[in-house]
Amino acid sequence: MSSDYTAIESDIPADTNPPPSYQNVSGQMETEQTNTNSQTTNGSTGPQTWTDRLKESSHPVALLFYMFFRLAPIFIYIFGNLFIGLITSKNKFILHFIILILLFAADFWNLKNVAGRLLVGLRWWNETNATEGNVGEFENVWVFETADPNRYINPIDSKVFWILLYAQPVVWMVFAFLCVLKFQFLYLLLIIIAISLSLTNAMAFTKCDKFGKANNFATDIFSRATGSIFSRLNPFAS
């Protein structure tokens, strides 16, 4: 006995597209998340702005004032007559001269007494002492002060300090050369004052830095030598 079966076709057309694979969907989500994380990481490692660098400073206020007093005299020297001309047309040179002299003095004092001590741990001053055996004769003595060698010196503070310390007198020398070419001898006198003040600070802080390093080196050698001798003479040392 034989039986024949006829396949019954459904009225609803079959979906030719296969069902979505959950593994593929999860894989795409992981890929997108990885790309997003990589973009975020790349964005966070971008170039730092001046604000970001100032935030890393140990003394941001002192660093800002140092940069201001170092750069303000140069800016006022170039554009000072323009701004003064907007206020008054009389005695522009005298006002320009007085403002620059005040900025030179403020920069010299701030660098010598505040910025050097806070940013790089260095300070200097000059003393006048009477010479022994000679009445009425005096000698100038340079006194250098350095911070504790264990004190942390911020690299950003140190880099900005030394760059502006040496860059400013170079800029004033360029301006002095231009004044000679233009026969501006009154401004040349002003620039000579700026060069003398800036070079004095540059030379003094350079000597102070070398003195501090040499003193720390000698102290380190002496402490090691005395420690070695004491350990050898100590009978209880292992």
UniProtKB/Swiss-Prot annotation:
Glycans are attached at N24, N42, N126, N129. Residues 30-46 have a biased composition (Low complexity). Residues 1-51 are annotated as: Disordered. It is a multi-pass membrane protein. The chain crosses the membrane at residues 67-87, 91-111, 153-173, 175-195. It holds the Pfam family DUF846. It comes from the Eukaryota. It is found in: Golgi apparatus membrane. GO terms for cellular component: Golgi membrane. Keywords: Glycoprotein, Golgi apparatus, Membrane, Transmembrane, Transmembrane helix. GO terms for biological process: protein secretion; vesicle-mediated transport. InterPro entries: TVP23-like. Belongs to the TVP23 family. PANTHER family: GOLGI APPARATUS MEMBRANE PROTEIN TVP23. Golgi membrane protein involved in vesicular trafficking. This is Golgi apparatus membrane protein TVP23.
